[in-house]
Amino acid sequence: MTLLTSSLLLFSLLTSRLEAIPVLEKSPAHPAHSAHTAHPAHPSPGVRILRAPESLVAPLGDEVVLECETSLQPERFEWSHRSSRSPGAGFKYLRTGTAKANVSQEAAISRLRVLVRPDTLGEYRCVGWFGPLVVTSTTARLELASTSLVDAQEPESPLQWRVSAGNSVLWSCGQQVQSNPSASWSYFRNGVEIKPEFIGTNGNLFLSNVSSESSGSYSCQATNPASGERIQLPGSLQLQVTPEQRSQSKSPHLLKGQPSSQEITIREGSSLLLLCPGVGSPPPTVVWSSPDVVGAVKNKRSKVFGHALEISNTRVHDAGTYICFQDNGVRPALEHYIKVHVEQPPQIVRPPWADLTNEGDRLKLECEATGVPTPEIYWLLNGHSSIDDTEAELSNNFLILHSVLKRHAGYVQCFARNRLGEHSAGTLLQVNPKQIQEPRESGGTHRPNPNQGSKHKQMYPPTPPNVTRLTDESVMLRWMVPRNDGLPIVIFKVQYRMVGKRKNWQTTNDNIPYGKPKWNSELGKSFTASVTDLKPEHTYRFRILAVYSNNDNKESNTSAKFYLQPGAALDPMPVPELLEIEEYSETAVVLHWSLASDADEHLITGYYAYYRPSSSAGEYFKATIEGAHARSFKIAPLETATMYEFKLQSFSAVSASEFSALKQGRTQRPKTSTTEEPTLQMGDRDTTTPSHNETFNMSPMLTGTIGGGAVLILLLISTCLCVCRRRNSRSRGNNPNKPRMAELRDDFVPLGNCSPTKQRQRTRHIHITLNPLAQQQQQALEEKNDTDQDAPYYQRPSSYDYDPALRRMSSSSLRRSQRTLERAGGSNGSNNGNNNNLNQTAEAGAVENPGKPGRVLMKRPRLSSRSENLSSGSLNSVGV
């Protein structure tokens, strides 16, 4: 792949970003990092090197295989090489299929076959391409196997040692051999190979508690395990063991050729064997100690075998000086010093941490590593060395970018290396590009016209979406609208296209509202949306279409290529556990969660939070939480005093975890004002809402008292209503079921029987509404009555037994009533029966009492509380 193509792929990520949606804010209570706490790799792209190529030592002409494995299958693998002939030169990408290098790929594993030649020796790297991201492995060295003598001199005369029985003898045979890799040793006595008592002595032959049978001629041989080459060392040892009783007493001392001190270098984690030279007569007793290492001898990892001290699983703090003290009772005693160096491979303890950075800003990244010797730190920006970047400066463990440019967007890796190996860590650098303002026409000062409104405002497009796999058929998109003063956006539409020839863009049906026209951060406003009904094992591109207030639209740049992998091919993501939903305020809650102790945070880019009211069965609102280290977040705004249900899932650039268990929480209730309320005027009402404690914390006794009082008041009101109704019924008559005609007749009383005390009530008349069906006929009759006042009518002579004035008034009232009855009888034949019955009743009363004067009926006063309406019946008037 050419550099031009690589640059085009990188450009697609320049404006990509991972931000939270508007409803999210960082929790105010966030634990601070201690000075020794390592930052997690954030934001992580979700991909990493699982198995880097290992350094190899091989003979000339051999073929070796370097393997590299990534956590996810990349779009492609590439290998780079730096020759050992020019160590100062940079790495160069290899051409595959050549005679000296052949690359093959199987899923997420790449293999490089190399023929060992002088020009193929050197360092190799594996490079994985994930869209615009470039992830580089640590360096593997390919070295040539070799074995040689340090000083090729003429053979020396054999060593002649004479010791008494019971002593321990140490012979350093392999001090003159240099081998890569380390040689394996064979020892011979009188030409016969013997098995050494201790293995891994690096060319030292140790014989403990020698006897006369140990006497003889000793020699050694070095073998290169890679090439199989063997070297017979020229030196030899002639050992003579004498009986102890024949030897004279001698203080502990060293034999000819034995070192007075030793210096040993070992790799951390290996087993360390310290051997103490020296003999005496009688054989001395050995005591081990160390002035530098506390508890170096007396611990679970240390074992003492007389003249030998073995320390397993060596650690860095085991380095120091060890003393072998020998004493046999004959002065002086012997002290032998051994200096131990423990080397440690590099390990990055504080990886770089890059947040969203504006284009043109200054960025400082730190990378702290441990190791012995002290590791060297170097940086790669999307696979390219920072040394070649004009904006980059290296200062101790820091990488300083004086001005962040678009080409810096991508994966930034820190490497720590020493002679034992390399270690790397990386972070995703996101660059927020500058918004390019369209130049205004020159020629005078431009003054804004308030009447123009938003006519000349610019349409700023959203950033390209970041894509995360949700399921085998769906993805989550995240994008941002940078802060600007352009035309407001109304809605968004999501478009996607399958990569391939003749594949068209498709638009989803959902309209994604812009929401409130305000920025949720200094950088702008973020959004999320999901796309479903995709096909696994296919590559897609996505873009966002923004619709503005002028009904015009503008598209974002397309996303990087996204390969939708099936879930079976992905490692499961850590599932967060919701611990608590904190009632933060009336419109906000804070989510608290945790991860399992064995969860790998390096796989996590952030978290998705889903929430909705518990009473709703609709879709969940979505929120994005950035950073694998986040353990709490505030969600706002929410409805007051409303119960919500929440669930979480972690995500990376290529996949998302399973959902956490649902957990419910609610926002706080409105707080009751503690100030004194003003006096309520007429028509006002108290609308103060009781607080949560006032509503639910009343004592049971108070509750029972209030309830009992309310019941008594209801009973009292019911009793009063019943008594009033009964009195009202009695005042209307004892027979509530008597006919309406009889009731109407009772409304008129005989004038002769009327007592003087009721004269004041005679002016109160009943108002009778005519039948609506006969209103027109009644109106015509009334007009006829007005024109014919002398119409004849029949009336029995009446006698009055009281005041003449009252007699004249009653007579006039009766004449009007009789004329009304006669007109009704003439106009509505259906009512004659009722009128006749009424007249007949009056006449029958006169016949039955012939001796009494005729009765004249007058209207009886009615209570004002009763209203008579006879319009629904057939009676239209009253008969006398």
UniProtKB/Swiss-Prot annotation:
Cytoplasmic-side segments: 725-880
Disulfide topology: 68-126, 173-220, 276-324, 367-414
Compartment annotation: Membrane
Protein name as catalogued: Interference hedgehog
Family that this chain belongs to: Belongs to the immunoglobulin superfamily. IHOG family.
Organism: Drosophila simulans
Domain of life: Eukaryota
Function summary: Mediates response to the active Hedgehog (Hh) protein signal in embryos, functioning upstream or at the level of patched (ptc).
Glycosylation sites: 102, 209, 466, 557, 693
Domains as described in the record: The first fibronectin type-III domain mediates a specific interaction with Hh protein, in vitro. The second fibronectin type-III domain is additionally required for in vivo signaling activity.
Encoding gene (name): iHog
Location of the region described as Disordered in the Swiss-Prot/TrEMBL record: 429-467, 662-692, 728-762, 775-880
Annotated consequence of substituting residue 308 to V: In strain: Ky-b
GO molecular function: coreceptor activity; hedgehog family protein binding; heparin binding; patched binding; protein homodimerization activity
Ranges per topology, Extracellular: 21-703
UniProt membrane topology term: Single-pass type I membrane protein
Residues noted as binding heparin in the record, renumbered to the chain: 497, 501, 503, 541
